């Protein structure tokens, strides 16, 4: 990944919104950022945590999730971890609720 230690949350959100059509084409209907980058306490080596909802209930095929991750990584320069909203355990959903920033 490139040196993106100074990328702001606003820049991340803007880049995600720019590529939203390509992400939606992979079946993603909603996308939110959470974790250290959403909270504003990320380290230079922190990844980007993304929560998605998809057209179909359940998970997209793995290759589609990888494609979405690569789209995001190419746009932001950040290593990306994708979580599926439908597959999160309730305790995890509660833990990240305060961090969630809806992108689309």
Task: Locate predicted features.
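Conserved histidines in hydrophobic membrane contexts and catalytic metal-binding motifs
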Residues: 33
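Short hydrophobic/aromatic beta-strand micro-patches
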Residues: 51-53
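Catalytic core of pol beta-like nucleotidyltransferases
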Residues: 1-30, 39-40, 44, 55-104
């Amino acid at each position: 990944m490139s040196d993106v230690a100074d990328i702001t949350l606003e820049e991340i959100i803007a880049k995600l919104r720019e590529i939203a059509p390509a992400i939606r084409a992979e079946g993603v209907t909603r996308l939110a950022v959470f974790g250290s980058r959403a909270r504003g306490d990320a380290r230079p080596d922190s990844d980007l945590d993304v929560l998605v909802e998809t057209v179909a209930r359940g998970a997209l095929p793995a290759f589609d999730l990888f494609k979405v991750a690569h789209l995001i990584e190419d746009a932001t320069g950040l290593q990306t971890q994708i979580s599926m909203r439908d597959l999160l355990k309730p305790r995890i959903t509660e833990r990240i609720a305060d961090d969630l920033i809806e992108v689309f």
